[in-house]
């Protein structure tokens, strides 16, 4: 009878190098051929789960208290097995009776009825010894144990890699990467196995080699053939148009694999829009940069919460085809555009929470980037960084209104603002936020960088509000880059809603703004809150001052910037923006070939 060994015994077991005799090897192979009984047991949860298939084909999922004695769990398994056997027997009897009835013969008793089936013997073995029934579940269900139900044996797998979530996008287009959304427990995507299939065209002859996976009975169908792609991401080609896709995947952790799963796309692959505004830009970004460079992207991707309003469809973007404003369509373009830049840093604005988790994370993670998110109200900011180049050290996000009201760092600024209560009220009503991530180089630990990302207040008459927000942002960035991490350089990305002629831009580039600047009265004299502002940074717009980064029917102008610290960084190259002809092919942005009303800024920076 197996019971929990003492600590000394456990140390002894761990110290012995396992060597299998021929008999043990045979036993090991037999165990490998067994059915699986999957146990999920997490210390932070009161219950464990047990999943296995009975001989009748039914699948059982049980939840048992971790602190429960094993005997109770085994008794419950026996009851379930008996019920399953009874159902099978009843089904057989029903079929037999129907067969007799159809032949016109009565079902006469030829003897006594068979005796009622007894509960099968259910035992749990570990190292070929039966586990005592008073051992608690948490200790009894060990990896490698054997569960026996009647004559059937199951290999117990405790906490194997498993998918907790697996989804394909609803809208799939030829030429655009398909990135499944994955939720993994006890595993990682890099150690998992993926295999893509596509439907056989209706009426097409099945190839001589179907290419179907022999390890999965569910794939033994002539309706599917292999695509030849065994990676997490699949990009359909024009030949796939009209066909659905299937993904077969097995979760792994580098040491073992868990139960496989498969899923099919809801809709067939559709034709893409042809040439997109970013296709030519991708010619400059075919490869990831070397370690001494930082390819940086700043992009307002247009939140779905704004794109789907009646005002957007009829007033802001009436020239845009309605289907091209739908998220299912736009996210294909966004994913392809962003992944094609092979960026090291990506700062995004107007990111819906669901878009971050369901679309951006799966797509960019598959290409080696990891992201953090900061919500504003209905949407927020996202910063992604290449994991092979950077690790995240800390985050220092703030809400401007909360920081102004409660953080001593902004006491002086708030006192100046309070001299005009009306202006103060307007500023403190705004929900704008600042996202700050401190990153460290994975190849040189002495290199750290402060990456800031923001989206300032949008209203055309909100110039003074943007000045206050920028002043608060630079004070907070100074605290992070000078006080918390002395001397680290700054990259400040965002949609600043300010053209190069505004006070905000003047303040950032020149280091100061006078109290008589016209933007202090941007919403009239009654809200004038003139003050002299300065900051200590030496900043430059890495992409210069393009004619526009936002192009809609009623406005175009430069609103987006990547500001860099000239003391530590320099610009290696700026990826050219789309030509004016490309931008206006469909009148303005967004369009069927461009997913946002803004244009991404992309540049390669270099450490000095």
UniProtKB/Swiss-Prot annotation:
- One GO molecular-function entry: 3'-5'-RNA exonuclease activity
The chemistry this enzyme catalyses reads: Exonucleolytic cleavage of poly(A) to 5'-AMP
Xref: Pfam families? Exo_endo_phos, PDE12-like_N
Q: Which region ranges are annotated with the description Disordered?
A: 91-111
User: InterPro entries of this UniProt entry?
Assistant: CCR4/nocturin_mRNA_transcr, Endo/exonu/phosph_ase_sf, Endo/exonuclease/phosphatase, PDE12-like_N
Principal localisation:
mitochondrion
Q: What residues span the transit peptide? A: 1-16
The residues that hold Mg(2+) 2 are 495, 497
Phosphoserine modification, residue list: 216
**SUPFAM superfamilies, per the entry:** DNase I-like
| Compartment annotation | Mitochondrion matrix
Gene Ontology CC annotations of this record: mitochondrial matrix; mitochondrion
Residues recorded as binding Mg(2+) 1, renumbered to this chain, are 350
One GO BP annotation is: cellular response to dsRNA
Instruction: List all Low complexity biased stretches.
Output: 100-111
Note the superkingdom of the native organism. Answer: Eukaryota
Task: Name the keywords, alphabetized.
Answer: Exonuclease, Hydrolase, Magnesium, Metal-binding, Mitochondrion, mRNA processing, Nuclease, Phosphoprotein, Transit peptide
Please explain the role this protein plays, according to its UniProt record: Enzyme that cleaves 2',5'-phosphodiester bond linking adenosines of the 5'-triphosphorylated oligoadenylates, triphosphorylated oligoadenylates referred as 2-5A modulates the 2-5A system. Degrades triphosphorylated 2-5A to produce AMP and ATP. Also cleaves 3',5'-phosphodiester bond of oligoadenylates. Plays a role as a negative regulator of the 2-5A system that is one of the major pathways for antiviral and antitumor functions induced by interferons (IFNs). Suppression of this enzyme increases cellular 2-5A levels and decreases viral replication in cultured small-airway epithelial cells.
The cross-references to PANTHER family, in alphabetical order and at most eight, read:
2',5'-PHOSPHODIESTERASE 12, CARBON CATABOLITE REPRESSOR PROTEIN 4
Q: Which family does it belong to?
A: Belongs to the CCR4/nocturin family.
Q: What is the protein name given in its UniProt record?
A: 2',5'-phosphodiesterase 12
* Taxonomic source organism: Rattus norvegicus
Its taxonomic path starts at: Eukaryota, Metazoa, Chordata, Craniata, Vertebrata
Q: Which gene encodes it?
A: Pde12
